[in-house]
């Protein structure tokens, strides 16, 4: 996350968003070409970093556009749309066999589609003052419980979102049932 502000200050929100959406789109396609657990691990790390960048840019842009009066509503709607999209996206598993390359193309397509509203906007990108960041040590010293809690929540959510489908498959659920279980989570 410390890399993002310096990138934004150099080339702007729109270009950084476009760059990381493109990286995420490319990396998703690479999953269908290279079938290797180690490679997929590396690709997932790259995807995760790209998604952090995309979320940071989108949320900072929304935060800049919202007033103090409507910020909570704007960010609430954003989160509802975000989580609803992720939940409904699970049903795309039913359109193709998971071992085929089509799901990867579909995800890449949606990543590429995310660029259109940002690249075609007439609105100016937000301009933020450069703020000083915190080192991980400073963050831990300021809020040890907060940092540990955030890390544990991140790990547990990642495990749950990543492994619930694997667990459902091991219980011999159909693809529809797996997508429904992941939808509910």
Question: Across the structure, where does each feature detected by a protein language model lie?
Answer:
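Cytoplasmic helix-loop-helix junction between adjacent transmembrane helices
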Residues: 45-80
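Helix-breaking motifs and short loop linkers at transmembrane-helix boundaries and internal kinks
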Residues: 33-35
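C-terminal membrane-cytosol helix-exit motif in multi-pass small-molecule transporters
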Residues: 108-128
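Pair of pore-lining "gating" transmembrane helices in MFS-fold secondary transporters
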Residues: 45, 140-159
